[in-house]
């Protein structure tokens, strides 16, 4: 079974966009809980992409 490259790529690009947004939030000295919330969202997307890749490996 191969990972759906399109879906994994989309997830990774979404995470990259979120991380870019997080960097901007940090530079703007935004409220720490807002930053933390966005970090957790990015982690969730990365975990999902990782699960897809690992599932395809099995």
Whereabouts are the PLM-identified features?
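Solvent-exposed interaction patches of small proteins and small membrane subunits
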Residues: 1-58
């Amino acid at each position: 079974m191969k990972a759906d490259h399109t879906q994994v790529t989309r997830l990774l690009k979404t995470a990259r966009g979120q991380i870019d947004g997080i960097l901007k939030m940090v530079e703007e000295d935004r409220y720490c809980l807002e930053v933390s919330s966005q970090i957790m969202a990015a982690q969730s997307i990365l975990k999902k992409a990782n699960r897809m890749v690992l599932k395809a490996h099995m």
